[in-house]
Amino acid sequence: MNASAAALNESQVVAVAAEGAAAAATAAGTPDTSEWGPPAASAALGGGGGPNGSLELSSQLPAGPSGLLLSAVNPWDVLLCVSGTVIAGENALVVALIASTPALRTPMFVLVGSLATADLLAGCGLILHFVFQYVVPSETVSLLMVGFLVASFAASVSSLLAITVDRYLSLYNALTYYSRRTLLGVHLLLAATWTVSLGLGLLPVLGWNCLADRASCSVVRPLTRSHVALLSTSFFVVFGIMLHLYVRICQVVWRHAHQIALQQHCLAPPHLAATRKGVGTLAVVLGTFGASWLPFAIYCVVGSQEDPAIYTYATLLPATYNSMINPIIYAFRNQEIQRALWLLFCGCFQSKVPFRSRSPSEV
C-alpha cells in the first residue's frame, strides 16, 4: 500500500510538472498585448520600443469575438482629429461664403479666403492622418500625410503674413495703396506663398526624411531634425516680421490719433476709445498667433526623439487651435461676412446697407 501511495504521489508530481511546462510554453509563445502597436505596424512607422512614440503609435488589445485585433486609440490622436473636424467645418463655411458672394471677392477677402483654404486643408489633413494611422499604417501613407500637413500649415502661416503686410500697407500708404493694389497682384503674391508652402511639404516626400536613418529623426517622425529646424526658423522669421509690422501699425494709429488731437486741440473720447480698441485687437491677433505656434516651434528645436511623445502632442495641439481661431478673428467678425451668413441661413434677411469694401485693419 505504501508502494502504491508513493507511485501515486510520483505520478501527481509528474502531472503538475507537465502542466507547469505547458503553461510556460504557452506564455512564452503568446505575445504581450499590452505593448504599443502591432509589431509590423510599429516597424513600418518607426514607432518601436523607444521611449518616444512620435505621433504614430497605437496600442493593441486582445482579439475580439470575431478574432480581429482591436486597436486602442490614443486619446491625443482623438483630440487632434476633433480639432481637425472643427477647423474643417469653420473654414469650409468661410470658403463657401467668399466663393458664393460676389461682393466678397475683393483683394482683401481673397487673402482671407487663402487663409481659410489653407486652414481647411490642415483640418482635413488632421482627420485623414487619424484615419490612415489606424487603418492603413504604412511608411508611404505616413510620409504623404506629414507632407500634406506641413504644406497646409505653412500656407496658413504664409497667408497670415500676407494679411499682415496688406494691413500695414493699407495704413502706411492709405492714399495710394488702394489705387495700386490689384486683384492680379494679390493672386501673384498668394501664388508665390503657396508655391513655397508646397515645396516645404514636398521635401519629406522627395527624400528629406529619417526613414533610412532613425538617428536623424526629430520629435515629429518621419521629419528629420534639420527639416524641423528649417520649419521652426522660418516660423521665427515670419513671427518677427509680423511683430515688427504690427508695432509699426500701432505707431501709425497713434500718430493719426495725435494728428486728430492737434486739429481738435484735444483727443476726443471716441477717437481715444477707437485707438485703444484697434491696438487691443492687434495685440489679440498677434498674441493668439504666438501663443499657438511658439511652444511647438521652440520644442521642435530643443526637443529630441528620445523625449516622451506627450511633449510633442502637448505642443502640437495648441498650434492647431490657431487654425480654429483664425475664422473668428479674420472672417466672422467682419460685417460683410456676417450679412452673407444671414443671407445664407435665413434667405429673408434684407439690409438697406450696401456692401462696401472695408480696409484690412477693420477685419
Swiss-Prot record:
Lipidation (S-palmitoyl cysteine): C346
Database matches in Pfam families: 7tm_1 (PF00001)
Gene Ontology annotations of biological process type: adenylate cyclase-activating G protein-coupled receptor signaling pathway; G protein-coupled receptor signaling pathway; positive regulation of cytosolic calcium ion concentration; regulation of metabolic process
GO molecular function: sphingosine-1-phosphate receptor activity
InterPro entries in the record: GPCR_Rhodpsn, GPCR_Rhodpsn_7TM, GPR6, GPR_3/6/12_orphan
Places the protein is found: Cell membrane
Chain spans, region Disordered: 28-51
Extracellular side: 1-75, 132-143, 207-231, 306-310
Residues spanning the membrane: 76-95, 108-131, 144-165, 187-206, 232-250, 279-305, 311-332
Cytoplasmic-side positions: 96-107, 166-186, 251-278, 333-363
Sites carrying sugar chains: N2, N9, N52
Tissue specificity comment: Expressed in the brain, with a prominent distribution in striatum.
SMART domains, A to Z: 7TM_GPCR_Srsx (SM01381)
PTM annotation (Phosphoserine): residues: S357, S359, S361
Annotated GO CC locations: cytoplasm; plasma membrane
Alphabetic keyword roster: Cell membrane, G-protein coupled receptor, Glycoprotein, Lipoprotein, Membrane, Palmitate, Phosphoprotein, Receptor, Transducer, Transmembrane, Transmembrane helix
Membrane topology: Multi-pass membrane protein
Function: Orphan receptor with constitutive G(s) signaling activity that activate cyclic AMP. Promotes neurite outgrowth and blocks myelin inhibition in neurons.
Family: Belongs to the G-protein coupled receptor 1 family.
Protein name, UniProt field: G-protein coupled receptor 6
Organism: Rattus norvegicus (Rat)
